[in-house]
Amino acid sequence: MITRSSRLLCLSALLALTASVAVAQDALSYQTPPKALADLVTVPPTPGVSLTSKGDVMLILERASAPSIAELAQPELKLAGLRLNPANNGPSRASYITGLRLKKLPNGTEIRVKGLPDNPLISLVQWSPDETKFAFAASTQNRIELYVTDVATATATRLTNRALNATLGGAFQWTSDSKSLIAKLIPDARATAPAANAVPTGPTMQDNSSGKRGQAPTYQDLLKNPSDEKQFVHFTTSQVARLGLDGSEQPFGQPGIIATASPSPDGQFVMIETVHTPFSYLVPVYRFPVRTDVFTIGGQLVKTLNDGPLQESVPYSPDGAPSGPRDFEWRNDALASVYYTVALDKGDPKVKAEVRDRVFMLEAPFTAEPKAIYDAAFRFTGFIWGNGTTAIASERWWQTRKVITKLVNPSTNFAATVLFDRSSEDRYGNPGSPDTKPNQYGREVLNILPNNDIMLVNGQGSSPEGDRPFVSVMNLITKKITPLWRSEAPVFERPIATLDAAAGVIMTTRETPDENPNYFIRNLKKRIALIQVTSFPHPYPQLKGITKQQLRYKRADGVDLTATLYLPVGYKKSDGPLPTFVWAYPAEFKSKEAAGQAQGSPYQFNRIAAMGGAVFATMGYAVLDNASIPIVGEGQRAER
């Protein structure tokens, strides 16, 4: 039996507890981890870099150690598969550049860029085609602004008072004359944002009267009701305009949900893709209906190339594709030619077909019928354009992991010969990627040397000894591949840019377990000393001495496994066993041979990221990092 006195005692205790909780909540602030971990979180990361194509100027990109609490506290809307910030019309989750420096190579003085906004949050850095300027987006709490920097004076200037709309990405792109940019802007007459309404006005209806059956993946952050639709339309609607460096502004069409807006290589046309209704509650925005239009640079509509339907029934497979025209792109080595792909198997990998994808091309003035230029036995993944007689086409088929690379001659009805036919899982057999360079329009094309050689660059360079990046040369006539250079122990060196392919001059990063990656100029043909162009210090010298070993061992079924073992500073085997963290995630493979290939390098810098597994080595633990856990599915049953 509960007496009156006991009830009073319970009430007093409850009030005391409530008061103590309230005091604790009032006094509570964000806590800090142990100092060893806090030092890793707060140290500025090594800057990134961006180079001109000639390698004469380096842009150094400073980054913050972590986003601020103010950045993390920004609002977020999840609509149609997007996560956007309604306050500034950009992505809600982004990493930013916080400072810019310019350096003339190889030995110029670093100059800090002037004219940046206070506490800058910079993204989307993009060189002009003539490389005398670069543009970038600067985010604030309530808008995203477009800046252009003059390289000669290292001065940034805001180009327009209009705010960018970056909710769907691709907020701006230079035209080929380097005198203007095509940008997606917040419309002038945009109304107040519609308030979210969680109260339904009626049931959500879904119609499958066609009786079609099919699997569908589970997508995140889809539209759920008419209120979501209104917010989606409001925040993704843009006005495309050409912004001149002289202050001029030329709009294109009406405001709409602009997915992409890209100028032609010659700068005379602009291709715009506009998302429109009907929307879907089953698939994200990239499956919504989209209309593809071409405008003149003066803003007049030339032609609607396609108006694609809602794609709710794309076969559930990595080899599935939309059934109609898709992937409209400009041909990089032509003045104004559009190419696109159509799945002849209706996008269904279960349908047997000798030709699965057909590529079509349409040249300006876009009045003729599209011309079929390439047939792909598998899914077409793209061209690397070169010139009027040379291009490289790629195909892939996920079910078998097949990747095919073909040499194509655009001048002879796109006659094709196979260069490589390999498995995407075969890291050892990866020949590397063809070297490219910007052409006169500022578009990337194959860097073809006078003797029909091209460089092949592999920044990973997997081998039985671990990763060893390399550079080789392939002759496009004989198909012969000649190795030029490969990273050698005890250093990990990675090619990151070709400065002069004919002379064999490249830029690399070099690192060791205790030496931070820095940038060097290497001549592959002359045995001359490397030229060091950066001297980034060790970000956490207090952690020098953490040891790293590359381990190889066998699983019970005979599959070779790899892992990287980190041991604390000063640890000796005589100290006995250590508590150990295993940091791993399983991966799928089609064969035991591919699953057993080595990965990683014992000579890479000991980068102790605060969010990674290796950080526990700073606290006295052993860490088995990136331990391979292959799931091998051989045969047809492994397909989906």
Protein language model annotation of sequence segments:
Residues 50-52, 127-128, 174-175, 264, ...:
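Structural signature of eukaryotic scaffold interfaces centered on beta-propeller domains
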Residues 24-45, 102-122, 149-168, 198-199, ...:
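Multi-bladed beta-propeller domains
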Residues 116-124, 141-227, 313, 324-325:
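Asp-box/WD-like beta-propeller blade repeats and closely related beta-sheet repeat scaffolds
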Residues 1-11:
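Bacterial N-terminal signal peptides that target proteins for export
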Residues 58, 131-135, 178-182, 267-270, ...:
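Hydrophobic beta-strand positions that form the internal "hydrophobic ladder"
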